[in-house]
Regions:
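Alpha-helical junction/boundary sensor with strong preference for TPR arrays
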Residues: 45-46, 66
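Alpha-helical linker/edge segments of TPR/alpha-solenoid repeat scaffolds
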Residues: 60-70
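Inward-facing hydrophobic residues that define packing positions of alpha-helical scaffold repeats
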Residues: 39-40, 46
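TPR-adjacent "capping" and linker segments in tetratricopeptide-repeat scaffold/adaptor proteins
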Residues: 2-18
């Protein structure tokens, strides 16, 4: 074991955090459609299943908000 797997996991976590952070910023500023896309992107790079589910759920909620259904 040379630590590659660990650093690879850290990279995945960093990418998810980065994508999620952008999604939150868009969500807070009221840009729902863009936030939904950002959450979908975050779900795609999430290293854990529960994180993927959370990101998909947020994407769906943002999509509903942009269509006027809260």
């Amino acid at each position: 074991m040379n630590g590659f797997r660990n650093s690879s996991r850290n990279g995945q976590v960093w990418r998810y955090q980065s994508a999620g952070s952008r999604a939150v910023i868009l969500e807070v500023s009221g840009r729902w459609m863009e936030a939904a896309e950002a959450w979908r992107r975050a779900a795609g790079v999430a290293p854990r299943t529960d994180w993927q589910q959370f990101a998909r759920k947020r994407a769906e909620q943002c999509h509903r908000r942009c269509r006027g259904r809260v």
